């Protein structure tokens, strides 16, 4: 039986709207849940997430005016499971590398801030300087770096369950790989389930 752990980005990835031919986030989730239901009933697949990720997903749906019946179905097909905060074994090397990467990013962010300050002192529209600083600082410090407790919990849950982690988050995938956890992006996830279901349909 294949197990999947769902990250927030597995649902909110904007490419899914085009894939499913819909416009709203809640319509993506509706299609997702239909696929999950079929995969669980016909293939025995199971789907999990953590309480923090489920809270994030519900928050996105509530803000998108999602029908309440769809939100209520989330817990039917996606099982919510807490991670063990004392039993999970993560190699010390993973944390050593992570801390080193955080330090490198912070140093890079400092250089970005210094350069932006110099440019601002040379003149120009302050609002434009701030926008550029935010964009470059975010690029320097956050892109491809795990920066969320919810993401870390998703990776640990996948490790504990021996599950495949579904996410489009580059930093989360990097960590998952170091933990020996398989990681696939949301589009591959959808196409994988569809392919399995098509095989069952063709071969009974």
UniProtKB/Swiss-Prot annotation:
The organism's place on the tree of life at top rank: Archaea
Disulfide bonds: none
A Pfam family recorded for this sequence: PIN_5
GO MF entries: ribonuclease P activity
The protein's role, per its UniProt record: RNA-free RNase P that catalyzes the removal of the 5'-leader sequence from pre-tRNA to produce the mature 5'-terminus.
Biological process terms in GO annotation: tRNA 5'-leader removal
EC number(s) reported in the record: 3.1.26.5
Family to which the UniProt record says this protein belongs: Belongs to the HARP family.
Catalytic reaction(s) noted: Endonucleolytic cleavage of RNA, removing 5'-extranucleotides from tRNA precursor
NCBIfam families (alphabetical): PRK04358.1-6 (NF003345), RNA_lig_partner (TIGR03875)
CDD domains assigned to the protein according to its UniProt record, in alphabetical order: PIN_VapC-like (cd18691)
SUPFAM superfamilies: PIN domain-like
The keyword Hydrolase is annotated on this UniProt entry: yes
Keyword Nuclease: yes
Signal peptide extent: none
Annotated keywords: Endonuclease, Hydrolase, Nuclease, tRNA processing
Annotated InterPro entries: PIN-like_dom_sf, RNA_free_RNase_P
Protein name: RNA-free ribonuclease P
